[in-house]
C-alpha cells in the first residue's frame, strides 16, 4: 500500500513538473546564445555584421575589415548608414522631365511614366540611367588591420554574441595571438573595437570613392583625386576628419585609449599605430560635424549591450528546443539569425534596401514592393514601433506620390517602385508599371493599429490611407460586358507579365480587395460613411482566373501565361526535398541551373509554376492575405499542391517564394507542406553562417527572404483572425512542441 502511495506521489510530482515546464517562460538568453554564428576560417561568404538598424559594420574573420578585396565578391565588408548617400556631378544637366514618356495602356490611354528609353533617344536614355544611379548609398570607410596578408592568419575562432551585440574574434598572426571584440553603439553610428596582442598591429582607415555601379561593394580605390580626407582636429586621443566626396560632406571621429599615433599615409588613408598590447578605439560617422566628443569604448559597448538586451527581452520569440523532428533546430537557428540580421540592418527610418546595409544592389536604393517582405514582420513580432518608423517616411513621400498619380491621370497617390530617402522615382521600364506595392501602406497601417489601437494613430495616417485607396479605386476599369471591375495596364508582381497584355493578375486582384476593405474599415472607425463607389468595386471585382482543371492562374491574360489544359493531377501530397539547408557551404554552381529529362521538360513546359521568373502570386492571394469572396477554398487547395509539385525551385524561385508557399499552406491547414516549404534544401535559399540568404553571385545577401521567413513562422505559430488551431503551421505528430511568446496573429 505504501509502495503504491509512493508511486502515485512520484507520478503526480512528475506531472506537475511537466505542467510547470509547459507554462515556464522561454529562456530567451539560452535561445539566442545557442544559435550564435561561429566562424573558423577565412571565407568571403562568412563575414558577420554588428549594427543598430540604421548603421552597420560588416567584418571579416579578424573582427575588422582587413581584407576587403578578398571579400569583395562575397558578403563584402561594408560600412553603411541610412543617411550616407552620394550623387555624381550632373555635368550634362539632366532633368527629370527627360525621363518621362507618354505611354498609353489598356484601360488607361493617357499616362506619363518614368522609363529608361532602351531604344532612344540617346540623351533620354542617359538621363534615365543618371537618375537611376543617383543618389547611391555611400560606403563610409574601411577599418581594418594594416598591411596583413590572408596567408598570415591561422587558428580562427570567431563568435558573434547576438545577445550582447558583440563580435569576438581570436586568431594567430604569424603565430602571435590576436583577440578583438567589435561592437556598434546602439544609438549612434559608432563602431568600437578592443584589441589584445603583443603584435601591436596598426589599424588602417581607408576611404573609397563610390563606383556608381548597380551591384557591388561601392568602393573605387583608384580615384583619390576625386575626393578628400582632411584632419580638422587633432588631440592626443582624438581626431576629427572631414570627408568631401563631390557635393557630399560628412565627418569621421576617431578616438582611442592608451598611447597610439594617428598618421595620414595617403590622400584618403589613415593609420592608427598603438604602443600598448591592449588598447581600444572608436570610429564614429556623422552627417553633420559633431560638437561634443563621442562616447568612449566602454560607453559604446554598454550601449550595444543595452540595445540588444532590450530587443531580445521584448521581441517575439520562438523556442523549438522541445521539438524532436530533426528539422527543428535548423529552423530555430534560421529564425533567430533572421531576427538579428533584420534588427541590425533594417530598423531604419526608411524602407530597407534588398541587401540591407551589407553592400549595394540596385545602387543601394529601396524597392517599395519589398517592404512587405522586409518589414511587415515587425508588427507581428511585437515590434510595431520599428515598422512605424518606416511608415513615417511614407508621409514625407506623399507629395511625390501624388504627382505621379496626377501625371498618369489617376486620383489619390501612386507609390513609386524604386526610390531613395528623397522619394524621387527611379525610371524603369518595369518598375514604373508595377502596382503591388500600392496597398502596402494600408496593410502596414492596419498591422500597426492592430498592435496598439488608438484614435490618435487613425487620425495621423487616415489621409494617407484614404488617398492610397483613392488611387486604387481610380485604377480599376469597369467591364460592362461582364458587369465586373478589372485590373489592366499594369505589370504583374512576377514582372514576367507586362503592362501591355496583363489582365487581372491574381495577387493584385486579391490585394485590391483587401486594401479597399481595410480603407473602408478605417473610415468606419473614424465615424465616416463608407464610400459607395468602393463598395461597388468590392462587390464586383473580378474573381481570380482559373484553368480548366480548377487551378488558379497567375493572371487571367498575359503574354507568356501557359495553357493549363494538360495540368498535373493535384491529389497527392507533393514530394519536395526536406533536409538541412544550413550548411554554410559555397554553392557549387553560380547559375542555378538544373538538369531535367526531355520527358520532364515536355510534361512541365506548360505549367505556370515551372516558368522561371514567376513568383507564386496566386498563392500570395491567400496566405499573405486573408480569405475573401475572390477565393474558392477547393481551388486554392489544388493550386497549392500543384505549386508544391511543379514549382521550379532550383531555377526560378526567389527567397520569398518559400514563405509564400508556407503561409498559403498554413491557412489551408496543410502544415506538412508549410514546413517543407521553409526547410527544403535548395541552393537559391542557402543560409550562410550569418543568416543571410545566398541567392546568386549577384545577390549574396537577400533580406526579403529573412523577413518572409519571420512572417511565415509567426503565422505558423500565432495563426490569424478566427483561427482556432494551435500552432496551425506545424504537424500534429507529436514532434513539434513549438513554444512562443509575443507573437500576434495575421489578419
Tell me what each language-model feature is.
Residues 23-365, 384, 394-402, 583, ...:
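Acidic/polar, glycine-enriched structural segments that form the non-catalytic walls/loops
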Residues 173-181, 185-190, 447, 451-467, ...:
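A conserved hydrophobic secondary-structure block that centers on an alpha-helix together
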Residues 350-364, 415-433, 488-505, 603, ...:
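Acidic/His metal-coordination segments adjacent to aromatic residues that form catalytic metal sites
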Residues 1-8:
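Bacterial N-terminal signal peptides that target proteins for export
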Residues 9-19:
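Bacterial N-terminal signal peptides
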Residues 467, 471-525:
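Acidic/histidine-rich catalytic neighborhood
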Residues 65, 70, 88, 367-400, ...:
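Active-site core of glycosidic bond-cleaving carbohydrate-active enzymes
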Residues 120-152, 704-745:
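Catalytic cores of secreted or luminal carbohydrate-active enzymes
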Amino acid at each position: 500500500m505504501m509502495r503504491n502511495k509512493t508511486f502515485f506521489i512520484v507520478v503526480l510530482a512528475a506531472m506537475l513538473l511537466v505542467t510547470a515546464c509547459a507554462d515556464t517562460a522561454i529562456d530567451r538568453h539560452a535561445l539566442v546564445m545557442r544559435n550564435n554564428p561561429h566562424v573558423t576560417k577565412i571565407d568571403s561568404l562568412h563575414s558577420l555584421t554588428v549594427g543598430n538598424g540604421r548603421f552597420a559594420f560588416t567584418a571579416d574573420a579578424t573582427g575588422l575589415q582587413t581584407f576587403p578585396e578578398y571579400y569583395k565578391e562575397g558578403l563584402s565588408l561594408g560600412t553603411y548608414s541610412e543617411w550616407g548617400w552620394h550623387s555624381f556631378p550632373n555635368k550634362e544637366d539632366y532633368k527629370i522631365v527627360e525621363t518621362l514618356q507618354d505611354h498609353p495602356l489598356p484601360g488607361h490611354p493617357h499616362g506619363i511614366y518614368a522609363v529608361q528609353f532602351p531604344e532612344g533617344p540617346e540623351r533620354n536614355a542617359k538621363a534615365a540611367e543618371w537618375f537611376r544611379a543617383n543618389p547611391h548609398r555611400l560606403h563610409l570607410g574601411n577599418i581594418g588591420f594594416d598591411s596583413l596578408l590572408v596567408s598570415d592568419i591561422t587558428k580562427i575562432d570567431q563568435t558573434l554574441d547576438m545577445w550582447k551585440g558583440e563580435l569576438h574574434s581570436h586568431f594567430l598572426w604569424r603565430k602571435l595571438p590576436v583577440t578583438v571584440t567589435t561592437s556598434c553603439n546602439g544609438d549612434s553610428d559608432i563602431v568600437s573595437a578592443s584589441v589584445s596582442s603583443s603584435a601591436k598591429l596598426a589599424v588602417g582607415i581607408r576611404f573609397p570613392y563610390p563606383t556608381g555601379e548597380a551591384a557591388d561593394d561601392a568602393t573605387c580605390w583608384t580615384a583619390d583625386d576625386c575626393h578628400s580626407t582632411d584632419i580638422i582636429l587633432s588631440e592626443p586621443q582624438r581626431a576629427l576628419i572631414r570627408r568631401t566626396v563631390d557635393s557630399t560632406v560628412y565627418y569621421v571621429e576617431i578616438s582611442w585609449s592608451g598611447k597610439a599615433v594617428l598618421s595620414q599615409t595617403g590622400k584618403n588613408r589613415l593609420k592608427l599605430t598603438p604602443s600598448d598590447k591592449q588598447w581600444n578605439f572608436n570610429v564614429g560617422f556623422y552627417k553633420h560635424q559633431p560638437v561634443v566628443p563621442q562616447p568612449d569604448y566602454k560607453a559604446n559597448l554598454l550601449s550595444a549591450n543595452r540595445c540588444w538586451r532590450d530587443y531580445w527581452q521584448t521581441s517575439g520569440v520562438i523556442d523549438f528546443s522541445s521539438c524532436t523532428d530533426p528539422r527543428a533546430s535548423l529552423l530555430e537557428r534560421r529564425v533567430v539569425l533572421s531576427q538579428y540580421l533584420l534588427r541590425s540592418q533594417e530598423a531604419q527610418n526608411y524602407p530597407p534596401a534588398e541587401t540591407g546595409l551589407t553592400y549595394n544592389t540596385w545602387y543601394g536604393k529601396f524597392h517599395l514592393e519589398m517592404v512587405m517582405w522586409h518589414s511587415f514582420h515587425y508588427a507581428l513580432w511585437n515590434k510595431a514601433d520599428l515598422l512605424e518608423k518606416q511608415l513615417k517616411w511614407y508621409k514625407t513621400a506623399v507629395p511625390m506620390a501624388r504627382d505621379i498619380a496626377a501625371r498618369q491621370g489617376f486620383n489619390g497617390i501612386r507609390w513609386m517602385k524604386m526610390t531613395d530617402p528623397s522619394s524621387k522615382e527611379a525610371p524603369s521600364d518595369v518598375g514604373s508599371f508595377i502596382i503591388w506595392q500600392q496597398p502596402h501602406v494600408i496593410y502596414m497601417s492596419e498591422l500597426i493599429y492592430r498592435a496598439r489601437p488608438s484614435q490618435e494613430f487613425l487620425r495621423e495616417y487616415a489621409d494617407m490611407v484614404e488617398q492610397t485607396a483613392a488611387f486604387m479605386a481610380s485604377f480599376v476599369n469597369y467591364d460592362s460586358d461582364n458587369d465586373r471591375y478589372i485590373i489592366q495596364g499594369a505589370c504583374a508582381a512576377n514582372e514576367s507579365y507586362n503592362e501591355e497584355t496583363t489582365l487581372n493578375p491574381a495577387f493584385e486582384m486579391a490585394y485590391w480587395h483587401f486594401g479597399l476593405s481595410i480603407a473602408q474599415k478605417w473610415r468606419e472607425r473614424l465615424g465616416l460613411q463608407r464610400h459607395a463607389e468602393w463598395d461597388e468595386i468590392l462587390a464586383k471585382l473580378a474573381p481570380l482566373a482559373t484553368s480548366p482543371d480548377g487551378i488558379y492562374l497567375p493572371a487571367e491574360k498575359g503574354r507568356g501565361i501557359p495553357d493549363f489544359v494538360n495540368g498535373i493531377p493535384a491529389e497527392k501530397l507533393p514530394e519536395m526535398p526536406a533536409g538541412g539547408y544550413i550548411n554554410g557551404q559555397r554553392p557549387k554552381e553560380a547559375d542555378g541551373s538544373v538538369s531535367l529529362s526531355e520527358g520532364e521538360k515536355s510534361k512541365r513546359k506548360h505549367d505556370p509554376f515551372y516558368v522561371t521568373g514567376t513568383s507564386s502570386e496566386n498563392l500570395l492571394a491567400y496566405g499573405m492575405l486573408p480569405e475573401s469572396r475572390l477565393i474558392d477554398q477547393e481551388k486554392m487547395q489544388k493550386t497549392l499542391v500543384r505549386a508544391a509539385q511543379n514549382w521550379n525551385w532550383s531555377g526560378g524561385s526567389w527567397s520569398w517564394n518559400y514563405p509564400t508557399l508556407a503561409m498559403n499552406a498554413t491557412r489551408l491547414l496543410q502544415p506538412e507542406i508549410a514546413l517543407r516549404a521553409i526547410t527544403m534544401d535548395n541552393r537559391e535559399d542557402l543560409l550562410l553562417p550569418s543568416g543571410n540568404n545566398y541567392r546568386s553571385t549577384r545577390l549574396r545577401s537577400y533580406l526579403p527572404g529573412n523577413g518572409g521567413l519571420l512572417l511565415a513562422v509567426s503565422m505558423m505559430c500565432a495563426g490569424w483572425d478566427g483561427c482556432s488551431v494551435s500552432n496551425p503551421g506545424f504537424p500534429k505528430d507529436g514532434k513539434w512542441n513549438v513554444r512562443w511568446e509575443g507573437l500576434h496573429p495575421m489578419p
